[in-house]
A protein has these predicted regions:
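Conserved helicase core region in the C-terminal RecA-like lobe
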Residues: 24, 224-229, 354, 379, ...
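Helicase P-loop NTPase motor core
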Residues: 168-171, 406-408, 414-506, 533
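Accessory C-terminal helicase-associated subdomains
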Residues: 575-684, 705, 764-767
């Protein structure tokens, strides 16, 4: 049905503002919609596969049909009155029907698969003798390229292992082959993984192979770069590298740089120390030490000073961080060549997993250790190199043969994870990259189900459509663990998190995803709202001080003034003496404006904080604090989208408080939950697989990110190529079905489909 009664008026979806579908959806859940025929309660359906429609949720098999009448669109109630501001339509009075409507619903489309499925299944090699025969008898089979990779053990070997190509099987089987067939002593092998979890998984896999016992496995020097090289440091100087001296926690390192920042006059609540530590880590991993750093911005100049002091404090107190484990070993080998020679003679073979994610210090260590034998097996996929912010560089994989002459290369190009439709979509996306080894993955089967692109109106409707689709699939027999919702940055998950918390669906997310409402900029604006509701909210006062260009030390002055003047903390701001007449005058005006926010609609209240209270100026002067991915102005736009459904700041604050509490609760529950929908950044999803994958925000500005687009305009292609690799990683997580969301609007502005999808022609949706 396209018609329903809403607030005693008959409405028609075809004459309804497109942006109001989400409000109708929410109001339908509140019982505010009724059937235009029988007057029973109805709801609005918003899903991926079918057009929006009103339906009876309390009774099945309804026979009601739309009446042959047109709703009135010229009554005072049905007329929209809006203020247009910065891409957001701010309602003077909230209504639904308009004479001129925003663009209508856009039907989901199936991606046209550029190459047809060619059923040439990878041939399983039949072995007649030796250890490969034993593996085959144990149910461990290989295609031709996999078998070549397993038995090629001498000299440098580069294994390009595409997504879903059986990389772990090849790496573990190669290790077992060397131990059993070639009788290589396990302690002559170094097996390097990028996570402790991956190392444990490989050991577990090895125990299932014939001829391998636990003693052999435990004799292999295996683990992450950090764990292996830290053991070397401990062996040679246990006192210097004692675990008691390790800065294990982020807060310990942050404490040191914050102390250094105070000496430079940096505000604890204003300066992004977490990003500063990330930048310091990047410099260290690329072997750029204090005094050698070339700062590329004013922010980096500050961080370079923090870096200098951070290293001095550590040196003075005999402390070290995780990055120092690799740098320390690198320096040890440089300063003591006899020790380097000892370890060169200690190891004959090196197997390095996820080689595309290697950084400079890791690469240099492997080159140093393998100088004698050159028996380095590097396994990776340049198309999945996505950690440039940590110092990782696919160039080390691409140029491997230059440093290791005589390199053999094996390409594992059979994808055993995903159907042809998903594999071919991934091929079409990644083929546009220039900096890569030319290769094309092949699927082993087809499901004749094309990946879908769907077009929600905005982020709110995007979340609703996805949750509706998941609910439908679970009702049809799917399990929650069959679903993953992926996103480029944490902020993009806000709406879908809120929609899932309102559902009965179990879900879990990365532990480091903070609540959107706890983000620095968002919390700053909301603190003005909180202060208008409670003028003695000390926490809110502390959070608005940076935006008023006041140091945290002013808080004590406010407490004193509040007592002396017998006034609220808010009023005390008008008594603060800063020594600047202009600033003091501004603080006096602030009290009246903040108090007026209690009766101001949320969208207008945000604008008043931005413009009348100087928050916009604060963001401009603050810059993006070294964070190339998340700008303060973007947070404000996201907050405006989130605030749109609320009629008062009281409602918005209550919602924000609830969502912050739910964020903590979901993370706590998630630690013990297995059968749950996964919310994850694309970065965190790497190496994992799911039956159904939904990708949020496949639009320019999201993926590729604005930062990459800006870099491209300035002549730097690398960030854009990494963004394309990110999309490739997201697509190849799907084992069965893939849904790409292309919102028509993002952050209150018209959005354009991701340029990475431009090659993929579309065709009408085939239901599935």
């Amino acid at each position: 049905m396209k018609t329903a009664f809403y607030k005693n008026s008959l409405i028609n979806l075809e004459q309804t503002n497109r942006e109001d579908f989400q409000k109708l959806y929410e109001d339908g859940k509140k019982g505010l919609l009724s059937c235009s025929v029988c007057r029973e309660q109805v709801r609005l359906y918003l899903g991926i596969h079918n057009h929006p429609t009103f339906y009876h949720h309390l009774k099945r098999n309804s026979t009601c049909e739309d009446p042959f009448i047109q709703p009135s669109s010229n009554s005072d109630h049905d007329k929209d009155e809006y203020l247009e501001r910065d891409g957001f339509r701010l309602p003077k009075s909230r209504t639904i029907i308009a004479a001129e409507t925003t663009p209508s619903y856009k039907t989901a489309q199936a991606l046209k698969i550029l190459q047809p499925f060619n059923e040439q299944k990878a041939t399983s090699i039949e072995e007649t003798n030796g250890y490969m025969k034993q593996l085959q008898s144990a149910g461990v089979h290989f295609d031709e390229n996999q078998a070549r990779a397993v038995i090629s053990t001498e000299g440098p070997l580069l294994i390009l292992a595409g997504a879903g190509s059986g990389k772990t099987r090849v790496l573990t089987a190669r290790t077992a082959y060397m131990l059993v067939e070639q009788r290589i002593a396990p302690n002559r092998l170094m097996l390097v993984t990028f996570t402790a979890k991956a190392a444990a998984e490989m050991k577990k896999r090895l125990t299932s192979y014939p001829g391998i016992d636990l003693r052999q496995i435990n004799s292999i020097v295996s683990g992450t770069f950090h764990s292996i090289f830290y053991k070397i440091l401990l062996y040679h100087d246990r006192e210097r590298w004692s675990g008691e001296n390790l800065l294990k926690k982020d807060w310990q390192r942050e404490q040191i740089v914050k102390e250094a920042g105070r000496k430079l006059g940096l505000d604890d609540k204003e300066f992004a120390y977490d990003l500063a530590l990330q930048q310091i880590g990047l410099w260290k991993n690329t072997l750029q030490f204090p005094g050698q750093v070339r700062a590329e911005s004013a922010w980096e100049e500050k961080v370079a000073l923090l870096y200098r002091d951070y290293e001095k404090v550590k040196e003075t107190n005999g402390l070290f961080d995780f990055d120092d484990m690799l740098i320390g070993c690198h320096q040890l080998f440089k300063e003591k060549p006899h020790l380097l020679e000892k370890y060169q003679n200690r190891f004959d073979y090196f197997l390095i997993d996820e080689f595309q994610d290697i950084n400079k210090v890791q690469y240099e260590l492997i080159k140093m250790l393998s100088l004698r034998t050159k028996n380095v097996c590097a396994v990776g996929d340049d198309d999945q190199s996505i950690y440039a912010f940590r110092g990782s560089d696919p160039t080390y994989l691409l140029d491997f043969a230059k440093d290791f002459s005589g390199t053999k290369m094996v390409i594992l190009n059979q994808n055993y994870r995903s159907p042809h439709e998903i594999v071919e979509t991934a091929n079409a996306i990644i083929s546009a990259n220039q900096q890569r080894h030319k290769k094309e993955m092949r699927a082993q089967y087809t499901l004749s189900v094309q990946p879908k692109i769907f077009y929600p109106y905005d982020e709110e409707e995007e979340a609703t459509m996805i949750v509706t689709d998941i609910q439908e699939k679970i009702e049809a027999g799917a399990k929650p663990e069959d679903f993953a919702i992926l996103f480029r940055t944490n902020t993009a998950s806000r709406a879908v998190f809120e929609r899932l918390t309102a559902s009965s669906l179990p879900f879990k997310m990365d532990q480091d995803i903070e609540s959107f409402y706890d983000r620095f900029i968002v919390r700053g604006i909301l603190s003005f709202f909180r202060l208008s509701l409670n003028e003695d909210d000390s926490d809110a006062i502390k959070h608005i001080l940076p935006a008023l260009f006041l140091k945290q030390s002013v808080f004590r002055d406010l407490q004193a003034e509040s007592i002396l003047q017998d006034c609220s903390m808010l009023e005390a701001l008008s008594h603060v003496k800063t020594g600047f007449a202009f600033q003091e005058q501004k603080l006096k005006k602030l009290v009246k404006i903040v108090r007026s926010l209690t009766t101001t609609p949320p969208l207008l209240a945000i604008e008043r904080v931005e413009k009348e209270l100087g928050f916009q100026d604060f963001i401009k002067k603050r810059g993006n604090e070294g964070n190339k991915l998340e700008k303060g102005s973007d947070d404000i736009r996201d907050l405006k989208v989130a605030a749109r459904p609320f009629s008062s700041i009281v409602e918005l604050i209550e919602h924000a408080n609830h969502m912050s509490a739910m964020n903590r609760e979901i993370k706590a529950l998630g630690k013990k939950m297995n059968n749950a929908i996964i919310l994850s950044t694309i970065h965190r999803s790497k190496g994992l697989e799911y039956q159904n994958v939904y990708l949020l925000g496949a639009v320019d500005g999201s993926i590729p990110h604005d930062f990459a687009l800006d870099s491209y305009r300035n002549g730097d292609m690398q960030p854009l190529e990494e963004e394309r690799r990110l999309l490739y990683v997201a697509v190849t997580r799907a084992m069965e079905k893939l849904y790409l969301s292309v919102p028509q609007n993002r952050r209150g502005r018209k959005a354009n489909p991701s340029r990475f999808l431009s090659k993929l022609k579309k065709e009408p949706l085939v239901e599935s």
